[in-house]
Amino acid sequence: MKYSIIQKDKTNYSTSAWSGGATTEIRIMPEGSRYADREFLWRLSSATVEVEESTFTALPDYDRLIMMLEGEMDLCHNNGPWIHLAEFVPHAFDGGDDTLSKGKVVDFNLMLRKGKCRGAVVPMVFSADVMEMASEKLVPDLKSCRDCMIYCHCGPLSVKMEDGREVELNAGESLQMSGDLTNAEWNFRSENSARAVIAAVWNV
C-alpha cells in the first residue's frame, strides 16, 4: 500500500476565487485532471463561503457529498424544502440539482463521477471523552475502496497504521492512501479535540 502526506501549501493544494469566496482543491483524480474540463473521476475540496446566499454550480455528471467544517448552512434543492446542515454532518445530493444555499461557512466537498465511482465522507470529532477511533468502525468497507484520504481540519491528529507506523497530521494537512487497502487497519488518536474527515472512494 502507498501512503503519502500532502501538506497544505501552494505546491500541493490550489486555491481559486469565486464570486462568494474561495475554493481550495485538496485532491483531484486522475492526476493532472482539471476541474474546469469536467472530466475528472473524483475531486476533494474545501470552500469558504463569504456571502449569505449563493447558488451552487450545476454539475450534472457528478454526485456530491458536502459537510460543514465551520458554521451552519441551509440548502434548497430544486425548489424543495430547506435542509439545515450543522457542522460535521454529511449531506449527499445530485450535482445536477438546482441548489441554493444560505449561510457563511467553511465546507468540505467530495464530487464523484456518476456511474464510475461512489464515495463516503465520514466525520471524526474528538473530545475529552472521545480520544481514540478505529477505521473499521468508521468505514466498515474501507478495505475494498480504491482511494482514501484523511483531512485534518483542526489538529494535531495521530494516525497509526497496521504496520505500527505513526503519522501526525496538523491543521490543513492530508494523508492519502492508495493501492491495495485489503490489510488497512488504522487507529486515530487526539488529545486536543481534533476535527478531521475521512473521504473514501470505491469503484462501481
Mark where each language-model region is:
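Jelly-roll (double-stranded beta-helix
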Residues: M1-V204
